[in-house]
Amino acid sequence: MRLWPLSNDIKSKQFIKIFKRSDGEYESMIQRVYAGLRKLECGADITIATSKSQVSLIHNQLGCDVSVCVEPCRRDTFPAIVLATAYLHDVKGIAEDEVAVVCPVDPYVESDYFDALEKLGALAAAGGANLVLMGIEPTYPSEKYGYIIPTGREPVSGAEAFKEKPDAETAREYIKNGALWNGGVFAYKLGYVLSKAHELIDFEGYEDLYEKYGELEKISFDYAVVEKESRIQVMRFAGQWKDLGTWNTLTEAMGECFVGPAMLDETCSNVHVVNELDVPIVCMGLKDAVVSASPQGILVSDKERSGYIKPYVEKTDRKVMFAEKSWGDYKVIDVGQDSLTIKVTLKPGQKMNYHSHSRRDEVWTVIHGEGRVVIDGEARLVGVGDVVNMPAGCKHTIEALTELNVIEVQLGKDIDVRDKVKSKGGSDEEA
Amino acid sequence: MRLWPLSNDIKSKQFIKIFKRSDGEYESMIQRVYAGLRKLECGADITIATSKSQVSLIHNQLGCDVSVCVEPCRRDTFPAIVLATAYLHDVKGIAEDEVAVVCPVDPYVESDYFDALEKLGALAAAGGANLVLMGIEPTYPSEKYGYIIPTGREPVSGAEAFKEKPDAETAREYIKNGALWNGGVFAYKLGYVLSKAHELIDFEGYEDLYEKYGELEKISFDYAVVEKESRIQVMRFAGQWKDLGTWNTLTEAMGECFVGPAMLDETCSNVHVVNELDVPIVCMGLKDAVVSASPQGILVSDKERSGYIKPYVEKTDRKVMFAEKSWGDYKVIDVGQDSLTIKVTLKPGQKMNYHSHSRRDEVWTVIHGEGRVVIDGEARLVGVGDVVNMPAGCKHTIEALTELNVIEVQLGKDIDVRDKVKSKGGSDEEA
């Protein structure tokens, strides 16, 4: 929400495409991290632990063959890491003495970070400790992070204590004495976490744990495991590691001053523009400002002030105005009294689930590409200019034979994304 | 163009709805002036002289029964005033000894201005001069205006000389000596301008003049008439009279700090927002700034800098993204590779011209209201959810029985507003 209007209730900051790749395309934080991990020489096997609501987005941005461990609901980090570890062992068949390295995709990092992850894994494999933590060299006395107090200043040391979110004064003291940020990056052998899990949770294996997931206690991995473990190592990391949680920090990491159609006059200074609309943004005479536009809204803010956006976003209409799905994406282009018009883009070869709506009619007009629709069991090919009528209750799906753009008009009272009934059939295989 | 993105190639500043009426609705400059004139006790008969491209907009904003004298092409002010005067005399049958008062709709004025217009007309009727000019008390030594040097400082005097756009130094000198701005506001008896016209132009009456209009010399009324006339009076006017030609001056005249969906945090100061999009604009920590959004684009500018917008607007895509027509309005909601999707709003009882396109297909989906379409001569009623297909060449029109909203998908290569063929028929009477 703090990166509104680019983030909304279903798209969080990890998915905002804001970083320019060498080929000129833009990528998101999760795409950067995934690409960085895939380049590692050790050929790490990557699994993404995430909540249900993010799976479509992950498939959209990383491809449909990425390995995903889905949390059926939100618990805390201990249940999440146990579930992912059980998934690696029971579903992917990875042995108990193999090493897992856990890293969040939130922080902005560079290539040295991935090398450090590899070292972290090697330390865990060597078996000198049950848990190997990455300790990040602090760049300022943050009040938001947890601190690790290491036993010494050598590259790899033990951990003496863990301190949660101190005030700035205390943080400054910690840092003077060599304390490190706890970034939630650590490595362990699967067997270690599985045995800890069985001590604390009564479960058989992955399937059983998944079933019980909603009943598990909300408890952090730090609290349940890290702070109680004596066989622990801390590896110092001094490279780039930056939380891009606010517009102010996010724009610092942007390579150029704008993404999307924008013009800044020569009297603008320290201005960043991220424009996901098709219309141009013209900026003149601005200082220290961020300007961002999406189908969700438009933000114009002094960079320092941008951290205080939350109460204003809460006052806006929170209806989701754009989303990335596994099959492509959509954006709302008109909100009427009893209608909603959206532009749908399907990637070649992708298709929607076969579904129906109980309280709204829909009309598709194909504006680009070729596809195949199934309407109440009847398949037919569609191309530019073809119109498909789907009254409420009518089961429908569309599959893109080439990249496909469709204008979808939704008609009805109280149109709601949750009015969706999945159906069986409609295609050769289930989407 | 200087008020981009609210103005575009077909909508000029006079039509931007930015002034809050007492009933809470917003009105444009032309609506303000028209309402002011209609309130005059003298019951002035109002005719609007304008170019062809503005007629739809005038009908949209002032109603379809407003009297309009259309210039078939752009000449200068002398031909325009002669044409309008001939229109009043020959078409509307107004006698030669009746008075016409000419006033531009550009400046921002208040009610005392309309009273002054009435006095100007009374002076012309009294016959003490052939021409009665309004001389506006300057508020600063502008380099953009023409100056009238009056023969004295009394409320009504003679004119000694006219000076075009002096430098600021000279303007300051003029003002010290009692000079006034020439705002192009003046009154005369129709017979006077008609006789001047016949001296300079060989024409029979209005119809003949209209036919010849394109061949007339481009010459200003000031140069052709005012500066050569010795029987002239100048009436001083000291009320509000402000050119709102830039964002900086326009926002000064706004009653509130925003129009349209917007939120400004408490750290904003001297910030104005005009938002014609449906999505909210959130402003935080801005100073002396103007923010404006329309389907044409988004402007974020320091107020002083906003006067330098022209070269940036010239670099944007100039395709017209919204327009007001006599029957309602439309806005572009999606631009595809070979498609354009627009939202059309028709006012109750209004209809489009019966027309066809030679190089594009169209699909209408009715999203609100009820109407009647005529497709290649066949009439039928349409309501919410009805879809109408119009391949290239198909003649079509739609009439609104209630307020009507339609999503129109245009499909074809090089879609252009000029691809429009008007047809006969299609309705009981021609639109």
Regions found by a protein language model. Give the residues of each.
Chain A
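Residue-level signal for inorganic ion chemistry
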Residues: 15, 30, 84, 106, ...
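A structural signal for isolated positions on well-ordered beta-strands in alpha/beta enzyme cores
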Residues: 45-47, 101, 132-133, 233, ...
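Catalytic metal- and UDP-sugar-binding loop of GT-A-like glycosyltransferases, i.e.
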Residues: 103, 366, 409
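Conserved core of the sugar-phosphate nucleotidyltransferase
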Residues: 110-216, 233
